[in-house]
């Protein structure tokens, strides 16, 4: 059964916690991780890109010169795709890129992402994380104490506004509540800092 050290906000180890084998001890499945990350990034796309075809570009209603007798190539409009300023052929138009993968695949990917942090020794469990107010300096100090200053995903059991506001101005740091935990953010941050309560919440949902 995998284990993780438990720290206080001063960076001192105060114990050890046993992690669920069914959640944190699964083999890493790279193919599933890739599938879910691609889906998440696709779902973030706005899809508002647009180009104009020859029928949408302004102008070009008049034939530029007569069909025969000039010695020049025949043209019917200055908005043809082969003209500068003409329409675009097969260009992008607004579309919805979002799609879904099966729920079981998402759960498996989340377990794999958690396993990568356990295998790399990059999971730090906090006994508690309470801040008196939104203080970026205090959050930076806590991360420095935990030797996670280069970037971390901070996960709490419930939404913690003080933690959220304290973390959002720090580069490479993001705060989530347990129910928002996702594959992309886990893989995109070097460290996972998670409270003991959040571990229980994640295990309850994924076990």
UniProtKB/Swiss-Prot annotation:
Give the protein family.
Answer: Belongs to the universal ribosomal protein uL4 family.
Point out the coiled-coil segments of this chain.
none
Q: Where is the composition biased (Basic and acidic residues)?
A: 47-59
List, alphabetically, the InterPro entries matched.
Ribosomal_uL4 (IPR002136), Ribosomal_uL4-like (IPR013005), Ribosomal_uL4_dom_sf (IPR023574)
Against HAMAP family, the record matches this protein to: Ribosomal_uL4_B (MF_01328_B)
Renumbered to this chain, the Basic residues biased-composition regions fall at: 60-77
Please report the name of this protein according to its UniProt entry. Large ribosomal subunit protein uL4
Question: Residue ranges of region Disordered?
Answer: 44-77
Instruction: Tell me which NCBIfam families the record gives.
Output: rplD_bact
SUBUNIT field:
Part of the 50S ribosomal subunit.
This protein's gene is called rplD
């Amino acid at each position: 059964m995998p284990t993780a050290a438990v720290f206080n906000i001063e960076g001192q180890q105060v114990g050890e916690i046993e992690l669920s084998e069914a959640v944190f001890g699964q083999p890493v499945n790279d193919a599933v991780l890739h599938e879910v990350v691609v889906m998440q990034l696709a779902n973030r796309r706005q899809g508002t890109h647009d180009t104009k075809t020859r029928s949408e570009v302004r102008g070009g209603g008049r034939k530029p010169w007569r069909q025969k007798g000039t010695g020049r190539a025949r043209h019917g409009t200055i908005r043809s795709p082969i003209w500068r300023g003409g329409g675009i052929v097969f260009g992008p138009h607004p579309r919805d890129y979002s799609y879904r993968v099966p729920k079981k695949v998402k759960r498996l990917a989340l377990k794999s992402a958690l396993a990568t942090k356990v295998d790399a020794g990059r999971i730090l469990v906090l006994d508690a994380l309470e801040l008196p107010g939104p203080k970026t300096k205090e959050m930076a100090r806590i991360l420095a104490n935990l030797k996670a200053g280069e970037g971390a995903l901070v996960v709490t059991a419930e939404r913690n506004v003080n933690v959220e506001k304290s973390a959002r101005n720090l580069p490479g740091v993001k705060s989530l509540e347990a129910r928002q935990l996702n594959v992309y953010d886990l893989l995109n941050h070097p460290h996972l800092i998670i409270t003991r309560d959040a571990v229980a919440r994640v295990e309850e949902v994924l076990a």
